[in-house]
């Protein structure tokens, strides 16, 4: 059944911006002109914009003002592939409003977040003091993919120019049911690994002449999955390890395998870093099989932003107040979920908070959000920006 579009006489500016961006088929790492549109709109507001193309990835860095308080908005214009088109009720790159819902790829993740901030910037920019605030837009087309040349590169670029962000608001879809019900102040880290276990091939009828690599591997798997990682706390999930794949190569049922490759992923708390976790995993593996080889890939560091004593420089406080004003309730402060680009900007000196629309349909067929969630997010973002000059 197809979606029947609704007719709206005067759509809100955030909805208009969302429809413009969602109509661009920006499947990662393609930007499809999204950043050109943003650059056009931001330059009209007085931003100085730079565009960089790094290994096929488009990055936009926009700067307004020159004050000592550095506030940044981080977002991504790329989206995941739409999947089977026949399962969509409307074309994924032809945004449709129906029954007060906005449908299309990027409706939740995260072109509406960018659109809400663009609308909020138009509303608030005249009230900001350029002598007090430096306002950054940091946008990439490489968040859904490898994330090697997007926000990671932008942060390194800013660091080389001695730019120290105080606050970074990430427009990822952080909410559960309604915009403002949940914000993210940290994320667990992620580390993937590959273990190679060697045995000796032989006939299954003569096990004494062979060494079964799977049997050896199972002991390693048992040690890893039963290791007592910390269970976490109320404000940060604990460390978990999952075996994601095992491979012996070609298979017949009368041969004892000579080698096994084990793939695993660890989601870890801020109590570890990549180096300390890798060393612990090596120790666990070598305690079972000294000859096993292990390598690591796709590291993502954990981070946790904590409240600042200085309320004027506390992004968490500003976000909570803005959400209370817009919704009448305070948000749940969470660190759940997968990795995000917030990890690239987080530091002891930079508070990172994710605030966005509900994430219930992200990466799904018929991705959508309620229009009320978009409009609420625009109000929240506007209030956050206005708080920078209070």
Curated annotation (Swiss-Prot):
What is the main EC category here?
hydrolase
UniProt GO BP: diaminopimelate biosynthetic process; L-arginine biosynthetic process; lysine biosynthetic process via diaminopimelate
Q: Which GO terms describe its molecular function?
A: acetylornithine deacetylase activity; cobalt ion binding; succinyl-diaminopimelate desuccinylase activity; zinc ion binding
Q: Which residues bind Zn(2+) 2?
A: 109, 144, 363
Q: Which UniProt keywords apply?
A: Amino-acid biosynthesis, Cobalt, Diaminopimelate biosynthesis, Hydrolase, Lysine biosynthesis, Metal-binding, Zinc
- Tell me which family the UniProt entry assigns to this protein: Belongs to the peptidase M20A family. DapE subfamily.
Q: How does it assemble?
A: Homodimer.
Q: What is this protein called?
A: Succinyl-diaminopimelate desuccinylase 1
Q: What species was this sequence derived from? A: Alteromonas mediterranea (strain DSM 17117 / CIP 110805 / LMG 28347 / Deep ecotype)
């Amino acid at each position: 059944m197809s979606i029947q579009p609704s007719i709206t006489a005067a759509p809100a500016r955030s909805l208009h911006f969302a429809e413009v961006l969602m109509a661009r088929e920006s499947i990662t790492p393609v930007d499809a002109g999204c950043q050109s549109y943003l650059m056009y709109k931001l330059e009209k507001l007085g931003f100085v914009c730079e565009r960089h193309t790094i290994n096929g990835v488009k990055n936009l860095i926009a700067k307004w003002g020159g004050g000592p308080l550095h506030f940044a908005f981080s977002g991504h214009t790329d989206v995941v592939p739409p999947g089977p088109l026949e399962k969509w009720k409307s074309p994924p790159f032809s945004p449709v409003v129906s029954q007060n819902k906005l449908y299309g790829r990027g409706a939740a993740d995260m072109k509406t977040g960018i659109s809400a901030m663009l609308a909020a910037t138009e509303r608030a920019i005249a009230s900001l003091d350029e002598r007090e605030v430096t306002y950054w837009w940091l946008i990439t087309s490489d968040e859904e993919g490898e994330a090697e040349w997007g926000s990671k590169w932008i942060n390194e670029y800013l660091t080389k120019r001695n730019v120290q962000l105080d606050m970074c608001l990430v427009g990822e879809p952080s909410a559960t049911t309604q915009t403002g019900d949940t914000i993210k102040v940290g994320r667990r880290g992620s580390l993937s690994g590959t273990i190679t276990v060697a045995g000796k091939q032989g006939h299954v009828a003569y096990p004494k002449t062979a060494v079964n690599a799977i049997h050896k591997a199972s002991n390693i798997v048992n040690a890893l999955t039963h290791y007592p990682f910390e269970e976490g706390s109320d404000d940060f999930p604990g460390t978990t390890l999952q075996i994601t794949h095992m491979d012996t190569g070609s298979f017949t049922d009368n041969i004892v395998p000579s080698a096994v490759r084990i793939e695993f992923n660890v989601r870890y708390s801020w109590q570890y870093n990549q180096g300390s976790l890798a060393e612990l995993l090596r120790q666990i593996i070598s305690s079972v099989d000294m000859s096993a080889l292990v390598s690591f890939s796709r590291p993502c560091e954990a981070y946790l932003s904590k409240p600042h004593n200085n309320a004027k420089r506390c992004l968490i406080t500003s976000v909570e107040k803005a959400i209370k004003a817009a919704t009448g309730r305070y948000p749940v402060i969470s660190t759940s979920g997968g990795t995000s680009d917030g990890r690239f900007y987080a530091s002891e000196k930079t508070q990172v908070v994710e605030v966005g629309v509900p994430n219930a349909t992200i990466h799904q067929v018929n991705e959508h959000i309620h229009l009320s969630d978009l409009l609420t997010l625009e109000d929240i973002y506007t209030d956050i920006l206005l708080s920078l000059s209070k």
